[in-house]
């Protein structure tokens, strides 16, 4: 069945965002090689550096909070996860020089992936014109970093950009500058675009679920001191936080659905699905299937995992599982391991106002998402 379905054809809306010849616009052999390089950039050795980087970003983020206050955390996590993704993927040198221009360019690319782009990503629309201009400028900015690094090739950076620059295809040729830039953007989308929504929902559910959040906070207080360094190894020792995040991912998965384009007629249980059609599965709906998740709207981090393969698919599954799933979980745990020992949180608005926004493929809460924070004694 997988041979009759195409990911690349279904996700052509990403081509003007990532650039020509990148991922879903690359020939199958090159796409496979690019995805392998992307996986290599998110392997254990690099993630050891990333956990410390994320902890440092959280330190900087909360430095001006004071003892108490209110914030729209949908907006706050958009900014924080852009900083963490940029720092991890492009390195400290770029993060230190990161300007408001970069943020605006990146968000222009994000807006280029709205639902209409999956109908025709090249129609005459102001949002698509802004997307195209943003890609050209981002290619120039990231290209400048690549040129600097090539001029000082003796320095080791330990970030994703270094891995992308060292990556090769099966014939030994290296990625072009625009292919490297496209991989950076694609990986940033994986590390930021979806993670900001997950982080917002995690903090919102922590404010909602007081009994569970108390258990999570106790676990973190026991393992970490505020001044202690958060490491990849220590992040493996917080099962209650991990279970909490996994339940957030069940109720509020990063993507509402996954799509494929049918490239050869399929007879599915007696129903003909013709070539050229787009098919989709709803992760949001699958995670509410009562056959696998009794009382599905109840938030329960300790609910038994279903025995059925692919009943729980926040990052997809099988050979096409999201390459950044381990990075995403590490990032969530690092953020909250650094944040929760410092502050406790509560909802500002009535509980029912915190809802999923199902109008886009990437799931986030309907904004604003206001929470009140108080510094722990």
Regions found by a protein language model. Give the residues of each.
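Conserved, non-catalytic sequence blocks in retroelement Pol enzymes and Pol-derived host proteins
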Residues: 44-47, 151-154, 232-239, 322-324, ...
